[in-house]
Regions:
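A structural signal for hydrophobic alpha-helical transmembrane segments in multi-pass membrane proteins
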Residues: 1-123, 428
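Hydrophobic, aromatic-rich transmembrane alpha-helices
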Residues: 2-8, 166-181, 359-377
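Conserved luminal/periplasmic juxtamembrane motif of membrane-embedded glycan-processing enzymes
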Residues: 7-8, 13-17, 41-43, 205, ...
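Membrane-interface helix-loop-helix junctions at transmembrane boundaries of multi-pass membrane enzymes
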Residues: 13-18, 174-190, 374-392
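Membrane-embedded catalytic interface detector for glycan/lipid assembly enzymes
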Residues: 75-234, 238-239, 246-260, 443-446
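Small-residue-enriched transmembrane helix-hairpin modules in multi-pass membrane proteins
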Residues: 135-159, 248-368
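Hydrophobic alpha-helical segments
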Residues: 340-446
């Protein structure tokens, strides 16, 4: 993984937001961290594991290069010698002026949503006999979501408001990043709305939404900086800022979990390794101790890979067998907890075997590279709006690629009704921000 990261980094002109770098950089960190835990967990990866990860990774990388070469061919009618040149095209960025009234109206909506959802979470937790502090109630709701078949929905209105406000966070992050790149100043009201979106994402007890938004935001910042500065490579101080943001996110990960009621007995290093390198160890266990002994196709096609869409269709069509929990057993090694995540390869192997790894990794590479090229290319359609939705869409995909070392984020996230809702919500918020104007009302003395 480290070698593939180095190759992809330099053949992609050191564009750190490109799909191969997004995929291989975190996987490389996970592999390095696994070396640190070899004795602790008594890890001895088998050749089967190495081979499956290598084949899948090469399929992904090959698909990315094919998509890049295809872009060159479609433009010129022939393959150029330098087919790996930068896909980032410079663009004159405009300061996105958001009306103060627009910002305050949206902030008020988010505060109302925060209160409504928090009341609903507390009420549901107490209904199931959970009592205590706010963090205990939120943690209790998270556990109910994970381990009960009872209806614990916040209600259609609350859920839609929750999703809408969370999705708006991507727009607000884009505005903050764009305006900072243009003016070197932080736009305070959009930043306030961004903070509210992050706060709302934590109400259900999960840190995943906040992490998604922050990682996607970093991708937006990088692409916007590169387009604005007309540089393929980031300046050293910009790279340091990206690293600093990553360190802050990682450093506060356990503490945020504790605030949400998720207490762990492990030290910070062990806690982090459970999320970072344990998935590779768990994948090795599955390949050589479960799959190697008795592999059988699941009862539902694409059960693990397309779980979000299948669950939605099952509920919508009233097909009980399509509503299920993921098959992710918790594992331990040498007495240490290794969690229940198995990298992105697990879902493909579980559903379709080695053939699934090859086909789905190729599709992942093609889709992500095409979206990256859309995000980094100026479009005439984008001139109607200052906010480029392609950058936001790719930033969401960037997160799913970056967390492939963890689980099947790509197909879970993209092939889902939730992603379709986000597309609609992003368009709605963009219209509200850029096209809806309010005039201040003045009251004159009669």
């Amino acid at each position: 993984m480290v070698v593939l990261f180095i190759i992809s980094f330099y053949t992609n002109n050191q564009e750190i937001a490109s799909p191969p770098v997004a995929f291989f950089a975190p996987f490389s960190l996970a592999a390095i961290d696994l070396i640190y835990n070899v004795d602790k967990w008594r890890v001895e990866l088998k050749n089967n594991t190495y081979l499956i990860m290598l084949v899948g990774s090469l399929c992904f990388l090959g698909a990315v290069y094919f998509a890049r070469a295809g872009k060159v061919f479609l433009r010129s009618g022939r393959f150029e010698q330098n087919r790996f040149k930068s896909t980032i095209e410079p663009e004159e960025l405009n300061y996105i002026k958001v009306g103060r009234i627009n910002c305050w109206i949206f902030a008020a909506l988010q505060v109302i949503t925060f209160v409504l959802c928090l009341i609903a979470v507390m009420r549901i937790s107490r209904r199931f006999g959970i009592s205590g502090s706010l963090s205990i109630l939120i943690s209790g709701y998270k556990n109910l979501k994970s381990f009960t078949t009872e209806n614990i929905s916040l209600g259609r209105l609350n859920n839609n408001l929750y999703d809408f406000c969370y999705a708006s966070g991507f727009i607000w992050f884009y505005i903050v990043a764009n305006n900072f790149a243009v003016s070197k100043k932080v736009d305070k009201l959009p930043l306030l709305n961004l903070i509210l979106s992050i706060a709302i994402s934590l109400e259900k007890g999960s840190r995943g939404g906040a992490v998604t938004l922050l990682v996607a935001g970093v991708a937006m910042m990088v692409i916007i900086w590169q387009k604005k500065s007309k540089r393929r490579r980031l300046k050293f101080r910009q790279i340091l800022l990206v690293i600093l943001i990553a360190v802050i996110v990682v450093g506060t990960f356990q503490k945020v979990g504790e605030l949400l009621g998720r207490v762990s007995a492990a030290d910070f290093g062990g806690y982090l390794s459970t999320y970072l390198s344990a998935p590779i160890r768990n994948l090795d266990y599955y390949i050589n101790n479960v799959m190697g002994r008795s592999f059988s196709r699941p009862d539902v096609w694409g059960k693990m890979t397309f779980v979000r869409m299948i669950n939605f269709l099952g509920g919508f069509l009233k097909i009980d067998s399509w509503v299920y929990e993921l098959d992710l057993p918790f594992l331990r090694s040498n007495g240490y907890v290794c969690g229940n995540v198995y990298t992105t390869f697990y879902a493909y192997l579980y559903d379709f075997g080695v053939t699934g790894v090859i086909v789905l990794m190729i599709l992942m590479g093609l889709i992500s590279q095409v979206l990256y090229q859309k995000a980094t290319k100026p479009s005439k359609r984008n001139r109607r709006y200052s906010i480029n939705l392609w950058i936001i869409v790719y930033s969401y995909v960037f997160y799913s690629l970056a967390f492939s070392f963890f689980s099947n984020k790509f197909y879970e996230g993209i092939v889902s009704i939730q992603f379709m809702k986000y597309l609609v919500f992003w368009a709605m918020v963009r219209y509200f921000v850029e096209r809806t104007k309010f005039k201040a009302v003045s009251f004159k003395r009669i």
